[in-house]
Amino acid sequence: MASRRDFFKSFVKPTKQTTEELSPRLVRPPYASGESAFQSECPSCESKACVASCDEKIIFILDDGTPSLDFSKNGCTFCDACANVCKADVLSLENSKEEKLNAMFRISIEACVAHQGVICNSCKEPCIDDAILFNGMFNPVIDENRCTGCGFCMARCPTQAIDFRILEIEGEV
């Protein structure tokens, strides 16, 4: 008889491959003024203060010198720290009317254990916006109107069944 650990592991390997194929990992920090500002201002920023300011430790710098978010361990709390330290105002509270990232999350029905009949609400528990809804005890779905793209659901999913698609940053033309 297979153990519970083996059961969960059986979902991980195919999901990792699918996740990598589905979306590039380029989610920008909150309060962004637009992709062009990242490309023109961030590479010349020497302090990279946005990285040090992030208590969740999810901001990292790409090879091109621009910041991106990594949801593998945590999500964004929209604490404003990165925007408050950005001297070039690429990240600024003035840039956004709402707390929302340029990502829309989705749950893979094939990889999600709740969709396979296992009681699991790992994604719902950390969702501060109550954007993950369950049909009964199973079948979670993400309400796109409520989801801010914070990434906590992705960080907490034991089978890595949550992925995202990149959205255009508001303000970009």
How would you name each of these model-derived features?
Residues M1-V173:
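Non-ligating segments of multi-cofactor redox enzymes
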